[in-house]
Amino acid sequence: MKSTFEAAGRVAKGMLKDPSKKYKPFKGIQLPNRQWPNKVLTKAPRWLSTDLRDGNQALPDPMNGQEKLRYFKLLCSIGFKEIEVGFPSASQTDFAFVRHLIETPGLIPDDVTISALTPSREPLILRTIEALRGAKNATVHLYNACSPLFREVVFRNSKQETLDLAIKGSKIVTAATKNALESKETNWGFEYSPETFSDTEPDFALEVCEAVKGMWKPSAAQPIIFNLPATVEMSTPNTYADLIEYFSTNISEREKVCVSLHPHNDRGTAVAAAELGQLAGGDRIEGCLFGNGERTGNVDLVTLAFNLYTQGVSPNLDFSKLDEIIRITEDCNKINVHPRHPYAGNLVFTAFSGSHQDAISKGLKAYDERKAVDPVWKVPYLPLDPHDVNSEYAAIIRVNSQSGKGGVAYLLKTNCGLDLPRALQVEFGSIVKDYSDTKGKELSIGEISDLFYTTYYLEFPGRFSVNDYTLSSNGPQSKCIKCVVDIKGEKKDTPSRVVIEGVGNGPLSALVDALRRQFNISFDIGQYSEHAIGSGNGVKAASYVEIIFNNTSFWGVGIDADVTSAGLKAVMSGVSRASRAFAK
C-alpha cells in the first residue's frame, strides 16, 4: 500500500547538493535597539503544563481517563498552578475528564486554574465553556492560525477574514463567560493564541491581538493572556526573542497583558528560545514535562525549571522526587525518557571517562570538606547536586574500559570503605581497565570489588600467608617476630607450613627480615598507609604496603580487626603478587 506522499508522487530522493533551491532562510525583523541581550533571568515565569492537551494529542496511544487523572495529580503535586486539561470540543474523552475534575470535590486545588483549548468556531467554543463551567478558576484558550502559509494554503482566508474570525470568537467567549449570569460562579480567564505566531507578520499579529483585547476588556488585576507560539520552530532562538520583544513593547496596555511563550522543538532549541523569550518580555511559558508534544515536542518544562534552579533562582516547582515523576510520566505517556535527557536521564549524573571521574571525585571531596562554611555547589561536570533530586553519589561513577583510577577508587571508597593510596589507585585502575577490555562491557561495583579482593588476596590467601605469629621486644627499638607461614604451591593441595623468625624496628620490617632469612627473598617496603573501616565494635583496619622487588612495585592489601595483623597481611599480599609475577 502506497503512503500518502507516494500516492501524490512525492517519492524520497535524498538530500540536495544545493538546498538553497528548495529552502529559504527565515527572515527575522529589524530590531536595532533590542534590550533582551542585556538582561538576566532573576525569577520564574508563570508555568502552564499542556501535557494533558498538547502532549496527550501527540501520543501514539493517548491517555485514558485514569491515566489523565493520575497525571493531573502529579502536576498538582509538582506545583503547577495552571494546567491545560484537554480539548473537550474535539474529544468526548476529554470532555468527560474535565467534567469529572470539576464535579468531584477536592480534585482541583483552589489555587489551580484549569484551561481548555478551542478553535474559533461558535459550537466548539460553547462546548468548551460547557465543559469548564463550574470550575473555581478556568481559562478559555481560543486560537486561530494567522500566518500567510495557513491563511493562503490551509484556510484560504484573507487577512481581514482571519482578523474577523478572531474577533468573532472573542465576542462569543466574552458573552458566554464573564458577561453571562449562569457563569458567575467561575473566575474566568481568557487566552488567545495567534497560532503560527512566529511565521506571522509581526504587525498583523499585533493587529489581531489588539482587536481581541478590545473584545475581552482585561484589567491589570486580570490580564488577558496572549500566547505566542513557535508552532513550528523555524529560526534561531534569538529571532524568536526579537519577535517577543517587538510584540511586548508594541502591544497597548501592556500592564493588562500576560505574554505567554509556547516554543516547539523542531530545530532542537526550544529551551533556548523560551529562555531568551523570557528576557525579551515573556511572562509565562507553556510546555510539557520532558518535552513531550507534536513532532519533536514542546519545550521541556523540567529542563527550564532546573536551568533556573542551578542558577540560584527558585522555579517554584518541586522536582525533588524526580525518579517517581519520570516513572509516572513514562507509564502514562508510554514513551521513555531518553538516558541523555538533561537533568532527568539515567546517565546524566554518570561519568565513564577516567579524567571526568577523577575530577568529580576530587570535587565531591572538596565540597564535603568545605560545605559547612561554604555551601555553594562547585563540582566539576555536575551542574546539579544529585542529592537535590534524591539521587545518590554512588550512581555518578560507572566503570568501563574508558574509566580511570579516580572513578574506581571513588567506588571502592564509597561502597567498600577502602581509601586507596594514589599509587595503588594507578595500579588497580590499570588492572580494572584491562579486565573491562577483556569483558567488553561496563563493570558493576560488585565486579570491581570482587576483582580487588581477588587481586590482593583478601578473600583467599596468596602464595604466602600468615597463619599465626608472636611478637616480642628485643630492646627499645627492636621487635622480634616468630611467624607461622603457609606456602601454597602451584597445585591446589594442602599448603606447606613453616615457622620463620626475624628482627626489625617494627613488625613489618621484622617480617621482611624473616622472609629474607628463610626464603632468600630480598625486597624493600616503599609506601605504607592504613585507615579504619567502619566504627564502633565492628571497626577494622585496612593496611596498604608497597613492595619493591627487583626495582618493580607491587602493592599488597590487608584487612583485619587488629592493626598489626592487617599490616602483616598486606606485606604477604604484596610478596605473593610479586612472586606470582616473577614466576611467569
Swiss-Prot record:
Record-annotated disulphide pairs: none
EC number from the UniProt entry: 2.3.3.13
SUPFAM superfamilies membership: 2-isopropylmalate synthase LeuA, allosteric (dimerisation) domain (SSF110921), Aldolase (SSF51569), post-HMGL domain-like (SSF89000)
Alphabetized InterPro entries for the sequence: 2-isopropylmalate_synth_dimer, AIPM/Hcit_synth_CS, Aldolase_TIM, IPM_Synthase, LeuA-like_post-cat, LeuA_allosteric_dom_sf, LeuA_N_DRE-TIM, PYR_CT
Coiled-coil segments on the chain, per record: none
Molecular function as annotated in GO: 2-isopropylmalate synthase activity; metal ion binding
Keyword field: Amino-acid biosynthesis, Branched-chain amino acid biosynthesis, Leucine biosynthesis, Metal-binding, Transferase
Pathway: Amino-acid biosynthesis; L-leucine biosynthesis; L-leucine from 3-methyl-2-oxobutanoate: step 1/4
Protein's GO biological process: L-leucine biosynthetic process
Segment forming the signal sequence: none
Gene3D superfamilies: 3.30.160.270, Aldolase class I
Enzyme class: transferase
Reactions it catalyzes: 3-methyl-2-oxobutanoate + acetyl-CoA + H2O = (2S)-2-isopropylmalate + CoA + H(+)
One term under GO cellular component: mitochondrion
Residue intervals of the Pyruvate carboxyltransferase domain: 45-323
Cofactor list: a divalent metal cation
Pfam families tied to this protein: HMGL-like, IPMS_D2, LeuA_dimer
Positions with a binding annotation for a divalent metal cation: D54, H262, H264, N298
Subunit composition and interactions: Homodimer.
Family named by the database record: Belongs to the alpha-IPM synthase/homocitrate synthase family. LeuA type 2 subfamily.
Its biological purpose: Catalyzes the condensation of the acetyl group of acetyl-CoA with 3-methyl-2-oxobutanoate (2-oxoisovalerate) to form 3-carboxy-3-hydroxy-4-methylpentanoate (2-isopropylmalate).
Protein name, per record: 2-isopropylmalate synthase
Upper taxonomic lineage: Eukaryota, Fungi, Dikarya, Ascomycota, Taphrinomycotina
